[in-house]
Structures are given as structure tokens and as C-alpha cells.
């Protein structure tokens, strides 16, 4: 596995990583066959990689056994050039360590490790948590995941800089909702750290201040358009990138009209993918919201 940080200018994981939903059957079981079909569709339609068992994948309501089986099914079906990153984070350090070890042993291309949620550790605690994971992960590339709106805890750039002493800490998903987060990370950590936008609506603004790509929800539906936006920006066709950004804003907003992944699961259903309802305690999208979403999808 590649861990040379000089390669981060050409992001190890690619530019567009889809945070894939976990399909469920009518009975609420994981639909592994549909997960295989969906992941291959995503790869063929703009995604450079697939992120499994993250927020969008409903990791809080998946057992570790289900998460492992899902990874094995998807990874085994995809072309080797498609990176598969698996969520291994937990607010229990020992659990995160064991899950990350298992991801390494199973052949994952990387692990997404979220900031511990609920117990709100201080920065020194965060450093020790991620250090333990990095030490146990051998050369498995790690993507830190900062999403303070869900975790109640913010991973500061100074702490990220310290963590970069570990050769396998290569990237971060920045989902604070603050464009300044990218600027701060770049200023303190330099270009060796690949920063991914964690918000589709902030992808273009974050690209302008140094982000390399996105961990996307909208790419389930508009992966090719997102890819065109990124490469338009990179090639200096900023007006075209801006036009795509503006066209997709209603979709970006609609996909967060309520808690993710409720809207994207409904959007996929409206697009012909029967991925099932979210597991409890999440609930299906209301009929009124579904009508709004359907209108926006038809306008794409």
C-alpha cells in the first residue's frame, strides 16, 4: 500500500469518493447484492472510490459483522482501480483499533476514522486515540474525519499536524461546514495532507483554497457532473465549474433537508434504486419532502 506523502498532490484515493448508502431489504436486512450493483454503478459514473460504513452508510446501526460482510462483498466485486475505504471509527479506542486492523487484514484501500463522538475528548485525548489507531494499522492509509456537528468535538489543525508524524495519516475529510477549516489545515499541515470536502455544497469553494476532492453524497446521482466541475476548475475553466456548482446547489440543499442519509435514500428510490428505508431511529422521508425532492430531481 502507498504511504509516501509526496503522492498526495495526486490524491491516493482519487477526487470523488462516494459515501455510499447501505441498501436494506424490505425486512431491514443488509442487501449485499444490491450494494454490489450500486457500488459498480457509482464507479462507472464518476466515483474514483467508495466509502463504506460512514455516516451515509448508517454505521451506527450496522453490526461489526454486517460492516465486514458488506466490505467483503463490495471490494470483491469492484475493479482494483476503484478504492474502497471503510469506516472503522468509534468513540471507544480499542474498538476502533480492532476494526482498523480488520480492515487492513481484509484488504481495504483505506480507513475512515471519525473523531470520537459523545464523550468529547480534549485534543490530547484525540491525539492518543488516533495515534493508537495509526500504530495498529501498519501501512493502511487513514483518512481522519472531522464532523463536529455530529460528534460534539472539533479536531484542531495543530493536532492534525502532530498526527502527521505517522506516515499512514494521509488525508482528512473536513466536514465542519467551514471553508476556513481547509485554509487553516493547509497553513499548518502543508500540501502533504490531502483535504477532502465533506460537504457537496462547499466542494468548489474548498477547491479554491486547496482541497483535493470530496467525500460526496450527491455523487450517487450526479457523479459525472461533479467530476466535470472538479476538472473544469483544475484546468482553469472556472466559469464552467461555477455554472455546474450553481446548477447543483438545489440538489445539494435538498439532500440535507433533513438528517442524512434519509433524503439520499429517498432520492435513490425515486431514481429506480430500491435501497430501502433507513434503520431506526432514523425514519423515512415525509411525503411532502419527497415531493420537493422529486421536483428537484426532475430539473437535473
UniProtKB/Swiss-Prot annotation:
Q: Name one GO biological process term.
A: lysine biosynthetic process via diaminopimelate
Give me the reactions it catalyses: L-aspartate 4-semialdehyde + pyruvate = (2S,4S)-4-hydroxy-2,3,4,5-tetrahydrodipicolinate + H2O + H(+)
Active site per database record? 145 (proton donor/acceptor), 173 (schiff-base intermediate with substrate)
Annotated Gene Ontology cellular component terms: cytosol
Q: Does the keyword Amino-acid biosynthesis apply?
A: yes
Q: Which SMART domains match?
A: DHDPS
Site-annotated residues for Part of a proton relay during catalysis: 55, 118
Q: What is its EC number?
A: 4.3.3.7
Q: What is its main location?
A: cytoplasm
**Superkingdom field:** Bacteria
Known InterPro entries for this protein?
Aldolase_TIM (IPR013785), DapA (IPR005263), DapA-like (IPR002220), Schiff_base-form_aldolases_AS (IPR020625), Schiff_base-form_aldolases_CS (IPR020624)
Q: Which PROSITE patterns match?
A: DHDPS_1 (PS00665), DHDPS_2 (PS00666)
- List the Gene Ontology MF annotations in alphabetical order: 4-hydroxy-tetrahydrodipicolinate synthase activity
- Residues bound to pyruvate: 56, 215
Keywords, sorted A to Z: Amino-acid biosynthesis, Cytoplasm, Diaminopimelate biosynthesis, Lyase, Lysine biosynthesis, Schiff base
The metabolic or biological pathway listed in the UniProt record of this protein is: Amino-acid biosynthesis; L-lysine biosynthesis via DAP pathway; (S)-tetrahydrodipicolinate from L-aspartate: step 3/4
- Pfam families reported in the protein's UniProt record: DHDPS
Task: Relate the assembly described in the record.
Answer: Homotetramer; dimer of dimers.
Query: What does this protein's UniProt record list under function?
Result: Catalyzes the condensation of (S)-aspartate-beta-semialdehyde [(S)-ASA] and pyruvate to 4-hydroxy-tetrahydrodipicolinate (HTPA).
Q: What is this protein called?
A: 4-hydroxy-tetrahydrodipicolinate synthase
